[in-house]
């Protein structure tokens, strides 16, 4: 199991449970050594995806957990993962909604084959959030 954040931090429980960018570098270099290839060769084995990063600014009185539950209900026909917020898997990409623990905001990450598709997926779900909030 490995975890990571967009700011470059990696959490690798086999090493320790803290955020550590150097662990990510060590894992990457280890992978290069095991595969015996160059960075460009390793990169070529991965598909291209675009990620859109957005946020929804709310007010403190809004119950973000209830909003996320409503989004889950709206997309009940899609594959949903709610281990860390709400991640909705669509046929052409995904959207992950994650509440902040320090601010009244929801972070919205989406991924698709093109930036336009990633932005469109994010907008579709953001519009649902605003419809729920009213």
Where are these regions (language model features)?
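Phosphate-binding and adjacent anionic-ligand microenvironments
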Residues: 1-134
């Amino acid at each position: 199991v490995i975890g990571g954040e967009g700011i470059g931090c990696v959490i690798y429980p086999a090493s320790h449970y803290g955020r550590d960018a150097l662990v990510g570098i060590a894992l990457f270099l280890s992978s290069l050594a095991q595969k015996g290839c160059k960075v460009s060769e390793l990169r070529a084995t991965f598909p291209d995806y675009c990620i859109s990063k957005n946020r929804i600014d709310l007010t403190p009185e809004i119950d973000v957990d209830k909003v996320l539950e409503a989004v889950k209900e709206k997309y009940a026909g899609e594959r949903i993962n709610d281990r860390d917020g709400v991640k909705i898997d669509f046929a052409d990409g995904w959207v992950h909604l994650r509440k902040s623990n320090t601010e009244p905001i929801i972070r919205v990450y989406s991924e698709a084959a093109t930036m336009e598709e990633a932005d469109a997926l994010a907008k579709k779900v953001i519009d649902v959030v605003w419809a729920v909030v009213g």
